[in-house]
Amino acid sequence: MAQIRQEALKKQKSETQKSTEGFVDIGNLAQWTCSSEKSGFPIRLVRDDNIDTYWQSDGSQPHTIHIKFVKRVSIKYVSMYLQYTLDESYTPSTLRISAGTGFQDLEIVTTVQVEEPTGWVHVPVGDFGRNGLLDVHLIQIKILANHQSGKDSHVRLIKIYAPEIEQPAIAVDEIPYTSLQFISRNQLR
């Protein structure tokens, strides 16, 4: 059983790397809040990179997750790890993603139906913005319905993907030193 699970995890990781190649998760730059959480299953668990842990809502639907960035960011995907085989009626089936600069101007970006998901669900929100990217300060994920009419929800992981920006490396030889003091210290220790 453990070997089958490890093989499934490797396959999921490979598929995720292909679809998010050239993008980086920027979720660590945001403040995460939710409409409710069951004791012992806080929202921070969607950021722990462990598919065995999860956030669980506690209350009536819809359940919401708010992802607030300090600065405006340009995003391509909102990706969620959902596991129907383990969570059954706790697994979201209808998700609505909204975005804006704050709560006062949230606009619906897309509504997604997922059928018994097992693994990463990548929602290409960038398709609804300019130049293939969506500029936001705030993302709201609203869980409108669960499979089998379940009440509370489990979400195992969430990642927010933005384009990877390469910083040009400056070679030591390319730095134009002009003073004797700088030239004498231009070697790495």
UniProtKB/Swiss-Prot annotation:
Keywords: Cell cycle, Cell division, Mitosis, Ubl conjugation pathway. One of its GO terms (biological process) is anaphase-promoting complex-dependent catabolic process. Residues 2-187 form the DOC domain. It comes from the Eukaryota. Component of the anaphase-promoting complex/cyclosome (APC/C), a cell cycle-regulated E3 ubiquitin-protein ligase complex that controls progression through mitosis and the G1 phase of the cell cycle. The APC/C is thought to confer substrate specificity and, in the presence of ubiquitin-conjugating E2 enzymes, it catalyzes the formation of protein-ubiquitin conjugates that are subsequently degraded by the 26S proteasome. Acts as a positive regulator of the anaphase promoting complex (APC)-cyclosome. Involved in G1 cell cycle arrest in response to nitrogen starvation. Belongs to the APC10 family. The APC/C is composed of at least 13 subunits: apc1, apc2, nuc2, apc4, apc5, cut9, apc8, apc10, apc11, hcn1, apc13, apc14 and apc15. Interacts with nuc2. This is Anaphase-promoting complex subunit 10. The gene is apc10.
